[in-house]
Amino acid sequence: MAAGMYLEHYLDSIENLPFELQRNFQLMRDLDQRTEDLKAEIDKLATEYMSSARSLSSEEKLALLKQIQEAYGKCKEFGDDKVQLAMQTYEMVDKHIRRLDTDLARFEADLKEKQIESSDYDSSSSKGKKKGRTQKEKKAARARSKGKNSDEEAPKTAQKKLKLVRTSPEYGMPSVTFGSVHPSDVLDMPVDPNEPTYCLCHQVSYGEMIGCDNPDCSIEWFHFACVGLTTKPRGKWFCPRCSQERKKK
């Protein structure tokens, strides 16, 4: 496949990437704004509670505290959603980077294959020229036996032609030997060593993930499938390890 074809295919694959990135960034900005609005509401409720705590009944105090707690819960949900969006955005860009790496590897493999074919052709051409030179030398030898004029002219002609044959490979494509290229070497691209790993499976982020509500959790983020989830649970969620630790306490 020509270089232009690889470039065209890659550009087609990233055609929608700017729009997808713009959408995710806009969603994150919206989440930021909603979080700021909730924080302002929390400050207002907290001020109201502090200023009128003595005059409020127990039921009214509990109602205000519940509103504050629910607002904080919403803020955390928005924060989790923003982190999820950030992970999806990273994965989206990383997928295209891997695609580019794969296309570059395939293009390099094609170049090597063409160089090997050119080297084989150059080698076969050199053998043909050597064979032709031997025949011409025989003709020159026969010409020398026919007379002095032929004896002087033929060797010069033969030498001239021999000289051209010997120097011509220098202007041809050089012989280059490469190792065999397998499709698996191209398709099995290594994982980015700088990409962080998560979950009990110690894999990179992909798909839907959920964060553990234990602030001291050493893993923090988990794939839905690895912890047996299909939808995001309501309220606080603790990973299996943190749940066991909480039960021990």
UniProtKB/Swiss-Prot annotation:
PROSITE patterns: ZF_PHD_1, ZF_PHD_2. A motif (Bipartite nuclear localization signal) lies at residues 127-148. The modification N6-acetyllysine is found at K112, K127, K129, K146, K148, K156. InterPro entries: ING_fam, ING_N_histone-binding, Zinc_finger_PHD-type_CS, Znf_FYVE_PHD, Znf_PHD, Znf_PHD-finger, Znf_RING/FYVE/PHD. Residues 25-118 form a coiled coil. Residues 115-164 are annotated as: Disordered. Component of HBO1 complexes, which specifically mediate acetylation of histone H3 at 'Lys-14' (H3K14ac), and have reduced activity toward histone H4. Through chromatin acetylation it may function in DNA replication. May inhibit tumor progression by modulating the transcriptional output of signaling pathways which regulate cell proliferation. Can suppress brain tumor angiogenesis through transcriptional repression of RELA/NFKB3 target genes when complexed with RELA. May also specifically suppress loss of contact inhibition elicited by activated oncogenes such as MYC. Homodimer. Component of the HBO1 complex composed of KAT7/HBO1, MEAF6, ING4 or ING5, and one scaffold subunit: complexes containing BRPF scaffold (BRPF1, BRD1/BRPF2 or BRPF3) direct KAT7/HBO1 specificity towards H3K14ac, while complexes containing JADE scaffold (JADE1, JADE2 and JADE3) mediate acetylation of histone H4. Interacts with H3K4me3 and to a lesser extent with H3K4me2, the interaction augments KAT7/HBO1 acetylation activity on H3 tails. Interacts with EP300, RELA and TP53; these interactions may be indirect. Interacts with EGLN1. Interacts with BCL2A1. This is Inhibitor of growth protein 4. It comes from Homo sapiens. The gene is ING4.
